[in-house]
Amino acid sequence: MDKDTELSRDDFLPNVLTACEYDGKLAILPQTFSLQTVIGKAEDVGTTPGWTVEDMKALLASKPEGTQLFWGMDRMSALTALMNLGYNDFINWENASCNFDSQEFIDVLDFANMFPEEFEYRDDMEDSTVLMSQGKQLLDTYYLSDFEQVQMYRAIFGGPTTFIGYPTSEGNGAMLSLNNIIGISNSCKDVDGAWQFLRTFYLPKKSSDGDSDYTYGFSIRKDDFEKYCQNAMKADSDSGSTWGWGEFEVEIQPATQEDVDQVKDLVYNTTAVSGAVSDDITNIINEEAAAYFSGQKSAEDVAEIIQSRMQVYLSETK
């Protein structure tokens, strides 16, 4: 790309390029992306994205008994949610070291253990949208790819919402979900020829409303993304149409400037990538945590075992 006369890094969202780099080089490039985050009522979680496990625990503790964070969450899914971005808090990737035997990680295990061992679905259970509207469910996982969903959640929660994100000590708690990823193999015999083909997917469109030509998500081209945001504030064929979810129906209106600013702030400040952590790492944690959740071992013992296994893994894969 750096040698291309028509395309430059300035044409693309800088945070997406950063997320696609490995060892300082652009390794892959998606065509579109969405954002994976957690949404909640601003009255509950505040207006600034980003919080910690302690913040999440404090919110739940402040609510009446029976209030739940997410719908249908059991111990393992709670641990997954807590650790979606939490790995960076316990692993030093550069030094291949970790601190899973810390009190902070033990607290994560203890918090996850507060959830039921298994989620038992019943036909008479209230819909998630009803629980959120009544304040009985505080959060929901959110895959952001358009502005219509923003309006839907605002109606469900009955007020302004915040993309609070998954708990982490740094950042906004959101992750990029990359779509239609392509790249050039190290073994490619004609890199220039391969690029001449791949570049066609990223050239500026002669006529575009900024909406993606692909299946899902926002375009990674900066001009297309900005155009899409501007057009979202204009009345179009979707304006006045009705979106339904559970017990709720919302008449879709043009996005407000506040909606656009909120989404753009999240997009431009997210560099973490969903699925970037090896399955080997998540398997180590889940396998050992199961012994604590079943009462076979203490949280402290499990944390020590995870620390030992993880350190060996990091050393071997450094």
Predicted ranges, named:
Residues 36-40, 182-183:
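Short glycine- and hydrophobic/aromatic-rich loop-to-beta-strand nucleating segment
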Residues 58-64, 113-117, 125-151, 287, ...:
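Short helices/loops that flank or line small-molecule/ion binding pockets
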Residues 94-126, 151, 161-166:
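Glycine-centered hinge/linker elements that transmit conformational signals in sensory
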